[in-house]
Amino acid sequence: MNHNVIIVIALIIVVISMLAMLIRVVLGPSLADRVVALDAIGLQLMAVIALFSILLNIKYMIVVIMMIGILAFLGTAVFSKFMDKGKVIEHDQNHTD
């Protein structure tokens, strides 16, 4: 079996998985479920880009993959802080600078 066929099959599987996560984003039930589903979609998007870069032999796409990973991590970290404290940026009223 040609390796291109295997990559295309993997792409189809990942895209189907992304559609399932998109349903979770729309239906919920909670905000935390939606954020976790969005994070999973980010990881799956990284996999799709990696598979396309292998299929098309494009080596510089690793930079795009890393940027998506960083943005997904920051989004999850910001949301977890929001869930914990109710706000993202805290202003210290006692700070005298």
Curated annotation (Swiss-Prot):
Subcellular locations according to the entry: Cell membrane
Keywords assigned by UniProt, alphabetized: Antiport, Cell membrane, Hydrogen ion transport, Ion transport, Membrane, Sodium, Sodium transport, Transmembrane, Transmembrane helix, Transport
Main location: membrane
Top-level taxon in the UniProt lineage: Bacteria
Membrane topology: Multi-pass membrane protein
Transmembrane segments: 5-27, 34-56, 60-82
InterPro entries noted in UniProt: MrpF/PhaF-like (IPR007208)
A single Gene Ontology CC term: plasma membrane
Coiled coil location: none
Regulation: Na(+) extrusion is completely inhibited by the H(+) conductor carbonyl cyanide m-chlorophenylhydrazone (CCCP).
One GO MF term: sodium:proton antiporter activity
NCBIfam families, alphabetized: PRK12600.1 (NF009248)
Family of this protein: Belongs to the CPA3 antiporters (TC 2.A.63) subunit F family.
Subunit record text: May form a heterooligomeric complex that consists of seven subunits: mnhA1, mnhB1, mnhC1, mnhD1, mnhE1, mnhF1 and mnhG1.
Cited PANTHER family: NA(+)/H(+) ANTIPORTER SUBUNIT F1, NA(+)_H(+) ANTIPORTER SUBUNIT F
Record's function text: Mnh complex is a Na(+)Li(+)/H(+) antiporter involved in Na(+) and/or Li(+) excretion. Na(+)/H(+) antiport consumes a transmembrane electrical potential, and is thus inferred to be electrogenic. Does not transport K(+), Ca(2+) or Mg(2+).
Stated name of the protein: Na(+)/H(+) antiporter subunit F1
